[in-house]
Structure formats: C-alpha cells, structure tokens
A protein has these predicted regions:
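Double-stranded beta-helix
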Residues: 3, 101-131
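A short, N-terminal "cap"/entry segment at the start of jelly-roll beta-barrel domains
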Residues: 1-40, 47, 123-131
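Short, charged/polar surface micro-motifs in flexible loops or helix N-caps
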Residues: 36-37, 47-52, 72, 118-121
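Conserved hydrophobic/aromatic positions in well-ordered beta-strands
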Residues: 42-44, 66, 113
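Tight coil/turn sites that cap or link beta-strands
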Residues: 49-51, 88-89, 95-97
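A short beta-loop-beta micro-motif enriched in histidine and acidic residues
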Residues: 31-40, 51-65, 79-80
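Short beta-strand His + acidic residue motifs that chelate non-heme Fe in jelly-roll/DSBH
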Residues: 54-55, 75-76, 84, 94, ...
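A short beta-strand-loop-beta hairpin characteristic of the jelly-roll/cupin
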Residues: 60-88
C-alpha cells in the first residue's frame, strides 16, 4: 500500500522544441515523481496564439488517454486526420496504431493530462503534420 501526492507547484516544466513562429509547449513529466511502474503520464501546457502543436505520431502498443484540464484541445485523429475539438473536462482515448496530433487553436492556454499504458521502450513513430 502507499501513495504519492504531486502538488502542481512541484511540477518541473520543460519547454519542448517548436517552430520559431509557433508558441511553445511545455511538459511536466509525472511518471518518475509518481513512481509509475507500468504507465506513463505527463501534464502539457500549450500556449495560446497561432497553433501550438504536438508532434504527429502513433504508438505501436501504447494506448493514450487525454484529459482536458483547461482550454480546448483540437485533436487530429486517424488517417486521413479528422479534427475533433474537445472542451475543458473532455476526454479522448486513442488506441495503439491510431495517428494523432494535439493542437491549441484557441486564444486560451491549453492544459492537458496525458496518460499512456503500457510504457513503450521505443519512441512513437513520428508522422507528417496534420496542420
């Protein structure tokens, strides 16, 4: 038995690569501080503006669940990509092998909890951008 509590003030935010003309996105990696052994989780912040976006990708074995904590997530799913707008409180579950790309088209910051299982030993396959 046991538990771990991670307070938002304790998040260690890292800025991820982005195109020079795009707003940056930031990640707080939670798997290690939470002690996850069989899952993977992050909190993402996408700045508002001209479309901060994640990398388009797909996983071989990992399924991912996204919970929108603030803002509106524009998730491009499948091949060809179909845009799904997900409001605050909404959830998107993505099965392994499904192409996806997360984007913030809104004027507000997007805050997103991303959870995946099982954790993959190799990186996701990076695809061409949907936007």
């Amino acid at each position: 038995m046991g538990f771990r509590l991670i307070h938002p003030d304790d998040f260690e935010w890292k800025t991820r690569a982005h195109e020079p003309e795009e707003p940056p996105r930031h990640v707080a990696e939670l798997s290690e501080p939470a002690g996850f052994a069989h899952t993977h989780a992050n909190v993402w912040r996408y700045e508002p503006g001209t479309g901060a976006k994640g990398r388009p990708h797909k996983h071989k074995v990992q399924e991912e669940t996204f919970v929108v904590l603030a803002g509106t997530l524009s998730m491009y799913l499948d091949d060809p990509p179909q845009r799904q707008d997900v409001p605050t409180g909404g959830i998107v579950h993505v099965e392994p092998g499904t192409p996806l790309q997360a984007v913030n088209h809104g004027a507000e910051e997007l805050l997103l909890y991303a959870y995946g299982t099982p954790p993959e030993s190799e990186r996701a396959e990076i695809l061409d951008s949907a936007v």
